[in-house]
Amino acid sequence: MNKLSTKLVVAIGIGAALYGILGLWGFSIAPNTFIKPALAILTIFGALFGPVAGLLIGLIGHTVTDTIAGWGIWWGWVFSSGIIGFAMGLIQKRVGFSVKNGTYNKGDISYLAITGLIGIVIAIIFAGAFDIIVMGEPFDKIVIQVLGATIADVIVFLVLGLPITIGLAKSNKKHTHLKIEK
């Protein structure tokens, strides 16, 4: 098993803190369901540091949000944040892709978009099923939450997470071809 580097542990800590604190703010769209801009953190940190970082940032960060908010820890949704973070981080495993170095192509962006969207759908369905089966939540309520959360997360991913990640890669690309003049 690979050891986590100090840099990766620090990134996970910072990402989890940002995701956890920013997760306290959102716009209500359904019962106990919000558009939370914090989801963009999972996209950015996942693309920068990979699936393990995305997974841990989602798990730890969501636990922080639920703990601070005081409504109890909803483990299905905590795990769903981890799943989303993991899916967002899969892009980092593609050969030639690097936000840090500004190296990417259209295929990489498509891959991030597809894995991100699939990850969101799988994660939210998991959270809903967990709430019904384990937490005993009413089916009708969960259907509304799952639909609302899926729409909200897709919007945040497409409007904030994906464009910010592409923007970071583009800004780093500009600096990769600088030459020192003598």
Swiss-Prot record:
It is found in: Cell membrane. It is a multi-pass membrane protein. It comes from the Bacteria. The chain crosses the membrane at residues 9-29, 40-60, 71-91, 114-134, 142-162. InterPro entries: ECF_substrate-spec-like (IPR009825), UPF0397 (IPR022914). One of its GO terms (cellular component) is plasma membrane. Pfam families: ECF-ribofla_trS. Keywords: Cell membrane, Membrane, Transmembrane, Transmembrane helix. Coiled coil: none annotated. NCBIfam families: PRK13661.1 (NF010182). Belongs to the UPF0397 family. PANTHER family: UPF0397 PROTEIN BC_2624-RELATED, UPF0397 PROTEIN SPR0429. This is UPF0397 protein BCE_2667. It comes from Bacillus cereus (strain ATCC 10987 / NRS 248). The lineage of its organism: Bacteria, Bacillati, Bacillota, Bacilli, Bacillales.
